[in-house]
Amino acid sequence: MSAAAGVMKPEYGPSVPRLLAPRWRAASGPAKAAATAAAVALVALLLAAGLTLENAAYSHGGNAPFSFEYRGLYRTTPDRGEYMKAVSRWPDGSLKYEFAVGPLALPRYRDEVSAELALYATGFIRSLREEYPKFSLRAEGKTKINNTLTGYEVAFFTDVEGREMYARDVLLTPPEAHPREGVLVTMLTAPGASSQVGSPLEVGETGVLLRPLKSFAFG
């Protein structure tokens, strides 16, 4: 761009920065700090909003390597023991969706893995009751995730960050004989986040959490 092109034409009047400059110079230190903080927060919000619109993928190695795709979520710091966590929040900052993956370790067993997962779920549900004071079990049982994976689900109501949530945890293992290691998939959806999700059993069956769950694969 030439120098002439960069000059504001007189008929357009002064630029916005030139109009605001006197007020900025006259503003107090705390006012400037507050304005700067607000600008930084706005930029962070816009970046987060942009990231949620992009297709993304996550993969993890180890003895039970896995991968999945997601969209409409942005990665955040996982809780202790988790491999990965991605969330979406309402404009007021409250939790809207969450998809997290952590390790699953099974003891030695002789029966089919489906039977072992059902036994494991007994203690797992007990730990959920201890973790969530407002835990209310909706259902549990075998569930088919996609064409290659079948797991065991625990669907329940609970409160997270002070608000009611629909929750669905899925215990998954690789499709092999007597696996000992797998993953725990944790999914949360706020009531009202999706018109198609009206109970914990529908979490991950439609909407934002459908993609990461249905694209989940071991190997």
Describe the role of every protein-language-model region.
Residues W24, G50-G72:
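Ser/Thr/Pro/Gly-rich low-complexity linker/stalk segments immediately outside membranes or between
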Residues N55-S59, G81-K85, N146-F156:
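Short, hydrophobic/aromatic-rich segments at coil-to-beta transitions
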Residues I145-G219:
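Short, well-structured beta-strand
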Residues R25-T52:
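Hydrophobic membrane-insertion alpha-helices, especially the h-region
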Residues E130-R138:
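A short, amphipathic edge element
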Residues A64-G123, F157-E164:
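Secretory pathway targeting signatures of secreted, lumenal, and periplasmic proteins
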Residues P107-S114, E140, Q196-V203:
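Second-shell loop/turn segments in exported
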Residues M1-R23:
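N-terminal intrinsically disordered, acidic low-complexity segments at the extreme N-terminus
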